[in-house]
Amino acid sequence: MDQSILSKITSDDYVNAILHTSATRVGSDLHNAMCNVIVDQIKDSTEKNKKKKKIDVKRNLNEDQIQLLAELFPERRVVTSSVHRGTHSMAAAMRKIETDVIFTSFPKNGVIYDIGGNWATHAKRDDGGFVHCCCPILDFRDAQRKMTRLIDFNRFIDDAKVVSAEKAAVAAQIKKDCDLISENAKKDAYDANDLNGTWFCQNKFEDCVYDHSTLGDGKKEAYGMAIHSIYDIHLVDLVSAMERKKVRVLKGTFLFSADIIIGKKRGELPSVNGFYIIDGESIKYSFYDDPNCGYEHNLNSLMLYVTKTFVKAAGGAVYYLELTEMRGDTMFFTITDASEARVMGVLHDSSTKCLPLNKRDLVVFPLFDIDRATDELVFREELLSREFVNRALEYAFQLKDNQVTAEGLISYFASTNNAVVIGGSARKTSEKVDPKLLPMITTTLMVYQELQKAKQKRVLGKLKSKVKEELTLSGILESVVHRVFGRQSLYQRGLGVFAKWMQYSYGQDLVGIHDVPLYLEINDRIKLGSALKNVNGFSLSFSELDEKVSLYEEYERERQRISDEIVSEKIGLIGEGYVKVGESSLKPKQKVASRDGMAQWVSGECHLYNTMKCEEKPVEKPRRFSKVVLEEWISEGNCFALNNSFGDEVHWFDSLKEACGRAWRKQVSAVTFSDAEYFDNIENTENEELEEEEVIKTTEQVEQDWPIGNLPDVDPDDSASAQVCLTESASTSSDEDCDPMEQLIVAACERAFATKKFEEVTMDSQVVQSEEIEIVREGEHAHANLSSGESESSSQSQELVAVGSVPLSKWAQMVEDSEVRARQCAVDHDLSWDEVKYAKMPERPEEAEGDDFRTKAKREFLWYLKCKLVADKSTLVEIMRDFIYGQFHSGACETPKNACFLSYEKNVCGEWMFGKRYRHPSKGASSYAVRFTREDWKRAKLIKLQWKNAKAEENGEMSSDNSDKPIVPQGETGIYLFCDITFLMNEIPILNRLEISFKKRVQRRAPRITLVDGVPGCGKSTYVVKEANLVNQYVVTIGREAAEDLRERFKSERNATATQLKRVRTVDSYLLNDTQSRANVLHFDEALMAHAGMVYFCADDLSARSVICQGDSQQIPFINRVESITLRYSKLEIDNVVEKRLTYRSPLDVASYLTKKNFYGTSVVTSANPLVRSLKTVGPRDGMTSIYSIPKIPGTQYLTFLQSEKEEMRQYLGRGNWNVNTVHESQGKTYDNVVLCRLKATDNEIYPGGRNSSPYMVVGVTRHRRSLVYYTKAEDKLYFDLAEMLSVQEGKLMKHLHEEGVKXRQASKYEEIMVSDNAVTVPDVGNLVDLQEMYDIAFPGNSIVDTYFDGYEVATGGLQIDMNASLTYYPNRQMKMWKECRGMYPMLRTAMPEKRQSGLAEGLLALNKRNMAAPKLQESVNEFEVIESTIEKAKKVFFDESRIDNSKLETFEGAARWWVKQSCTAQKQMLADVRTLSEIDVTSYNFMIKGDVKPKLDLSPQSEYSALQTVVYPDKIVNALFGPIMKEINERIRVALKPHVIYNTRMTSDELDPAVEFLDVREDHESVEIDFSKFDKSKTSLHIRVVIELYKLFGLDEMIAYLWEKSQCQTTIKDRVNGIIAQILYQQESGNCDTYGSNTWSAALSLLESLPLEKATFMIFGGDDSLIFFPKGMVIEDPCRRLASMWNFDCKLFNFKNNSFCGKFLIKVGEKYKFAPDPYKLLTKLGRKDIKNSDLLSEIFTSIGDNYKSYDDYRVLEALNVAVMERYKLRCDVMFGLLALKKYINSFDLFASLFSHKGRYQRVEVGRNFEW
């Protein structure tokens, strides 16, 4: 057949025609065949439908809705019995089907957690599955749901004809759970365990404590489902809960529309007959057929489920989120545990998902309108039907230019809006455009048509020019130029950039018509850290690591070789030859000095205990020493005057000389004549050569040179034992016939005269001095000290420079500490014990691969001790430096660390400088001192001391002149520094002992650690006394008092002997004095207060196999006293825990408190003390307004949280037998009556409620037997807890119920996008009543307190004021009388205090409460290292280094600019002062108080009399010296700052706004807002010096830096009117020329060191205020702990959504951030009573008008309303008051009416610094 015919027959038209014709003829074959096919299809469909699971949704639905459900869920047979008529029936039906679909997708034998599910529905099932529902009651609707489900389930049970045993058990269990939860709720018990049940609990899934492992065999898998319940659950919280409960898969659903992603504020949800509305950060769901309440959820949380793919849980597990399908408006999702990928090495992944928008038939159409308020063109976009827009475009383009009119287009659009003309007839369409949009559509189309026609003409012209046959050179060049540079001119381009910057829209794109995207692409990625990282955080392969190790080892070997060569050239103090590395031993050796042997012995053995026992050993090798020195020593005995190279000042008495003589005579044959050799032949000393076999031995045989003198005993009854390093055989044997002192001398001779062996000699070897040789540590003198005859000296030094990263001249150079660049030369090696220098912190010790926890902990503890010494010595250097530089000049003022100085420069008996003697406040004399001279103070040495004793007085060696001074050798000059650091310094001998132990005492097996974890007072000490056998066991404890108590009890209860009692020691005493004891078991009392390494050291040294630790896991643990390091292994690894929960000390209410607050988990604490009640609280509302509210009760123990509070309490209690300790110091002690005090209202991490407060609360509450009274200035957690205990019934106290506060959920932040950015007019409404009500809402009750006569009562009444020792009062001044001053009467009643009048009482109160109450830093801080690292970081983070200007500061122009800014009065005062620079005392300041009292903006008691702010200011001539320089430096700093770092120089809100305009309001941030307390008064030397180092970057020279530092160190302030003089140490004087700048940069640099500011996106600093933004989601640790422990700042961190800075809120207004002043500060000041005349009122009005301009925008007031509600925790909206406030400050007449004034406005000019 022809192919064309076949093709026609097989075409669709022919086939359709045939089928239609044949199928309609009844009886035809084709008709019958088609009927059979259709019948078969119907039968198959019916059979398949029967196999589907039937679901009766029971809702009243129509046929269309049922058909829609069948289409959405084809795997189910959906029917309805229509027995329920409820709200949003379609949504409820879909929820039921979704529940069934997801439930059946899990295995039947698993356990399912249904989040927010209907437990009643699950309980009715008969499929054998088990479901636990988490149904928290977060609002009233949740409570309603619970009641509905209860009724539904009870009706199900009642209606059942037969209830199976299984269902009956389920019903009984549900009833039991309901009753238990209800009973607990009535008791206010809301703990997770209290709300737990079997089939359901009332906890959030994140807090659910149901344990599914209790079901069956405990191996059932857990799954999760969440049907429309995840809207408000943060995704990370959800997966973290899944990880905790081991839920591997979770499936769920939520309502979603693609319109949400494209930004539509309102959209339809047709499948559930509903709609959504986005309102700010919330999304609201409602239903058209539902009169009931809708649902409101967190939009930000919901969007995470749409946008995220990879989610990392809190514990590290990674979960994969998949959007599985979209059924109608319901999104199905699955979260699966994908952590196995990480195990397999997958560290990063990415995903892309496309969400279809289903908008193919729509286009984005631009519309324009006119804003009525601003008359500006406004723009918006609408989605219009593509068909309508195409018709409109076709019609508009076919019209001629004169036919395109608005009327014609609107007429056409109106007639064809929802109709289309086909064949001359109109047919309706489904979509219709809103008729209100037609005029705007017409406008857009007219402009669009005109632009397209103009564009068509341009294209036509260009095309014609291109198709010409002839070419021209000009045309080609023009085309190339336009192609490269564009046709637009440079001017137009610039205007374009400016327009874009100003957000000015223009061009053809304004009227562009675009298609809606088909889908929205969402990307997500995850990147996990590698498991292998080095200390710097960079990932390295094994080959790279091997290469680096080999390079490091080669470097160390070369460095060691060169060090040995240099030392060999310089060491001349041993009796043997020293062969250089790589040199033949046959070469002539270097000559040695004459006194070497004796100097070695004296330096090493000068201070020894007299009880040491030593074995005599035969001399194995000839002893070599100086014959001259030997003869002199025998004949005269004056060798003890030799200079000691270690800085140990030797103090010898007759008894020691006699012992030396006896020892010498007894051992003369063995030591001197029989086998002695002299290396200094008197006749021919120059020709002496050493033999080859006398070369130095290997380093393994070396003994360490360490001071072993009169070490301090920690325990007074501990007998001293020698610290000489002996072999075990020598130390264990004894010779009873030999005098101990003689044995000691013999052993010393053995060590001194035998061949000296050195180990690990490096360039940082110790300084050794003698009469003939001096080896200097400083690298800059190293070349000069090398032997001139050795040609290798210079080459060796050069080689050293080449090998090391630092030149030789900087290895051990003592720094010029006035410059940071010079401080970088500080020694970076381990300091010897007596070196007192700046040094960098030692590097953290490396960890070997095979190290166990014990080894790591011991190594870390050694490192901690070294760091502690480095930090302490750096502090000592700072104190010496301040002394040498003249910073200290008065003994009346305190000094750092209670430092004082004893000078032997002029007085041989010694003279205390400034008349200040050192006595430790509780322990007496110091064990160490730092000796230095003025000329060479950088070579200071730490020496051990001997003080007055009875024998010295008998011998006449003590006199009244030196009875309070240590014993120093005759002829020793210099200055001795004593302070709290040098008092004990046990770290030095302990470190020496432990380093030896770490190398030699290695136990193969780690001891087994058992912790007796007992509550306070449980009898831990009693357990030790009963269980410890002192014959073969050992007992150590942390505190001396505990050790003494244990010894007494062992003696009385166990009849222990004196020898046995020596096995009960403090840990320090054991490490210092006992090296020989061994024990199988070590009992360690309060072991948790010690570093784990210390415990392991004690155990290993004792060879103990078991350690029984007594401790309390909830009390204060080991505290790291070196702030700049982080400890990883400080906590013990416990093998076994024995719990003791019975206390014999604490009363019943304390036991109940410990139980209720779950300090010990679920354990119940019981007490044997029958006392029922012992707790009492006194808070700010109970009269605790100041420290004077605390009663002085003899015999009571006073406890404080902070050391500064302890000192304040001691001053308050005065002289007498008062017991005051910190909570930390009191741990382990017991008292009858305790007063616990919190004297500060500001937050601290150890205050109750703080991050680390729990141990301090436990210790503080459990010290007493009879009573505890808690006095607190803040109503903190402990205050409320103890107050709550007072209301507990006595019967309940015996039951120890649990209690915890109600948990609340915090919503996240989602900002609304705004298009318009125009100011909105504020309505002129409101009255005086609105202002008063606004104030009373925030501060109820504050306005009714009258304080008018408070100042009068203080000035005239009897007042007892304790004067600090640094205060002096001269009573011969004329007393100022209080005068009554009244002004205008304010109509507003606020808590604005009256102005105070200066007087004696006011001045003393201000000094005592402010300047004299400054906190003191307790931690060890290495200031040198902190300053260096902080300044280096500041250069990178704060400044553009290319703009740092360090040129000369002192210029005539700069001084002139500063001069013109001064007032005429100040200029006259400076001109009248003719003192020269040498006559000016920069440390002397004037003192006054501010009359204005800072008003309280909180609910703290108004009855407390607030101390006035103090002003400490220098003479004008001092400001003339520093003022121009500081002004220029601050100008240079401003220029060099990076754009995102803002320095607020007292700018107004309008001036600050440009600084934040670069911030995007659509981008969320993590904000840090710090509030400092007593900022000026908390300054230490660290603040002063770090700011000076910063200023040096900008040109501050050394002389001015010195004078500036001196002016802020020890200062004298004088109140010349009232006769008060005070001495102040390290405080920022509030009236000097750079107070604001110094405060700003002190705060900025401290925050830089404490926070990762390099990641900050915005930061602004001004005075003590700061505001910092970090990227959203970044985890930021609270810096307050570090600011307190390192920078001495008492502060708290604010976490507000609406941030504040310098009294101004940073708010989002339109498209920008703006600053707006705090309205409540203004409102409070409107209650002033001292405004006297119209002029001052006009000045105030003008100032308010300048500063509050932003209130003219209604949007600002709206944002402020939200901000103040959050900041002041208002219970309602205060917009009415803000409107009234704006109204009253915009009109002078209304403003004057606030003060009952009717005068006229006086035009005045107000300066920037005007304050009212």
UniProtKB/Swiss-Prot annotation:
Q: What is its EC number?
A: 2.1.1.-, 2.7.7.-, 2.7.7.48, 3.6.4.13
Give one Pfam family, short name only.
Vmethyltransf_C
Q: Does the keyword Hydrolase apply?
A: yes
| Name the record gives this protein | Replicase large subunit
Where does the Alphavirus-like MT domain start and stop, copy by copy?
A: 79-306
Report residues binding ATP.
Answer: G1014, V1015, P1016, G1017, C1018, G1019, K1020, S1021
Lineage here is: Viruses, Riboviria, Orthornavirae, Kitrinoviricota, Alsuviricetes
Q: Pinpoint the (+)RNA virus helicase ATP-binding domain residues.
A: 979-1140
Q: Where is this region: Helicase?
A: 1010-1272
Concerning InterPro entries, the annotation shows: (+)RNA_virus_helicase_core_dom, Alphavirus-like_MT_dom, DNA/RNA_pol_sf, P-loop_NTPase, RNA-dep_RNA_pol_alsuvir, RNA-dir_pol_PSvirus, Virgaviridae_RdRp, Virgavirus_MeTrfase_C
The protein's assembly and partners: Heterodimer of a large and a small subunit.
Q: Which residues form a coiled coil?
A: 543-573
Q: What else is known?
A: The replicase large subunit is translated as a fusion protein by episodic readthrough of a termination codon. When readthrough of the terminator codon TGA occurs between the codons for 1303-Lys and 1305-Arg, this results in the addition of the RdRp region.
Domain RdRp catalytic, first and last residues per copy? 1565-1678
- Say yes or no: keyword Methyltransferase present: yes
Task: Offer one example of a GO biological process linked to this entry.
Answer: DNA-templated transcription
Where is the stretch described as Methyltransferase?
58-820
Q: Which reaction does it catalyse?
A: RNA(n) + a ribonucleoside 5'-triphosphate = RNA(n+1) + diphosphate; ATP + H2O = ADP + phosphate + H(+)
What's a single GO MF annotation on this record? RNA binding
